[in-house]
Amino acid sequence: TLLTTLPAISKTIFNSQPLNQERLVVLAQAVGGNRWKLLVLEQIKPRPLCWETRPDGLVNPTLNNFNFAGICNRYLDSNGYSLRSSGEDVAHSFRLRIKQSRDRLELKALDPARSVPITVASAILPQRHRDAFVKLNLEPGWKLERRIYQGRKLSHVYFAHPDPVNLLIAKASAHQGPSAFKQLGAPKAPLPPPISIAKNSVIHGKGPIRLLVIPYRP
C-alpha cells in the first residue's frame, strides 16, 4: 500500500528506495506556447502497457485507454515527485521546471537563491503534439527512487543524485562556463580627451603664466 499524503516533515525523516528504472518514464507534456508539464509514469504490472513509444519518437500515454488502477502509477506534480541530493530531501528549496531552448527540452532544478540551475534530464524535441509526450532522459548520476517513511512506501518518487547540492551547483556552473561579461575582462577607464587650444583663444586663469624667454644675442 502506498501512502499518498503526509504533513510537512523534517527533510531528514524520509528515506528512499531504488526503483527499476525500466518501469518508469519521465515525460514532458505540451500545455501551450513554449510551456511544458512534467509527469512520471510507472508500470506496476507487465500488461497492459502504460505507455508506448511511437515511430516519430513521441510517447503515447496508453493508460488513458483503460482502467489503470493497480497497473500504472502517475506522478503529476510536486505532490508526486521532488528532488533528493546526497540522501537528503531538498524540495524545500528546489523546484523542477521544464525549459525549452529551440529544439531541446531540459528539466531544471531551480533554487531562487542560486543563479545556476541544475540539469536533471533532457531531450531533443522531435515535434510538438498535444496528445503525445516527449520522453526526457536522465542526466548521468540521476535516478528515480521511491520515498520511504518509517518503512512504508509512499506514492512519491525522487529525482535522486548521490552528490550533495553544493557539488551539483559547482558542476553546473563549470559546465555553463563564464558569462560573456567575465570573458571580456575588467573594464578599462576611458582615456582623457586631447587638449587643443585655438590660435586666437585667450586663456583665463589665476596665477602667473610661464612665458618662453629667448635670450638676446647682438
Where are these regions (language model features)?
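Extracellular/luminal recognition modules and glycoprotein regions
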Residues: 9-63, 128, 138-177, 185
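Structured domain cores in non-transmembrane regions
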Residues: 42-108
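Low-complexity intrinsically disordered segments
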Residues: 83-217
